[in-house]
């Protein structure tokens, strides 16, 4: 808990410079979308910047700050839930499932074929095979 307090203070000071710090904490920061907690706290690099990307995917998924600082961050991000309606500030880190992935828990990026090259290739091959077969069948029937 002490860490949280420390982070909060740190975030406040740093964010203040950005000019979004205060607003962020209340509006975007709260969910870590802007970088309020996750922002500095994590290294999320300023989750703000990442969350700011609007694709929270980048920041949220990257989970740099999330996993870096503490899984608890997920909790903060949760605060963003109500702010999810925000274009790119709230949803990113707040929703956590922006790309259908849980940044804090999963830890791996949604679009990272290198994570499971075999699985990815298998799936792709299967799809291709099926498609090809279907196509061939249609052609034959025609």
Swiss-Prot record:
Residues 107-124 have a biased composition (Basic and acidic residues). It comes from the Eukaryota. Likely to be involved in the establishment of the head. GO terms for cellular component: extracellular region. It comes from Drosophila melanogaster (Fruit fly). Residues 125-142 have a biased composition (Basic residues). Its main location: secreted. It is found in: Secreted. The keyword Nuclease does not apply. Residues 1-16 form the signal peptide. This is Protein spalt-accessory. The gene is sala. GO terms for biological process: gastrulation. Keywords: Developmental protein, Secreted, Signal. Residues 75-142 are annotated as: Disordered. The keyword Secreted applies.
């Amino acid at each position: 808990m002490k860490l949280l307090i420390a982070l909060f203070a740190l975030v406040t000071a740093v964010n203040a410079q950005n000019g979004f710090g205060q607003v962020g904490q209340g509006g975007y920061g709260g969910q870590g979308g802007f970088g309020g907690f996750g922002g500095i706290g994590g290294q999320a690099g300023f989750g703000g910047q990442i969350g700011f990307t609007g694709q929270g995917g980048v920041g949220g998924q990257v989970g740099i700050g999330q996993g870096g600082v503490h899984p608890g961050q997920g909790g903060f991000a949760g605060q963003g839930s109500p702010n999810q309606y925000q274009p790119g500030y709230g949803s990113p880190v707040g929703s956590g499932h922006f790309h259908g992935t849980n940044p804090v828990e999963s830890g791996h990026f949604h679009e990272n074929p290198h994570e499971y090259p075999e699985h990815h290739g298998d799936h792709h091959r299967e799809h291709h095979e099926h498609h090809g077969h279907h196509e061939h069948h249609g052609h034959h029937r025609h």
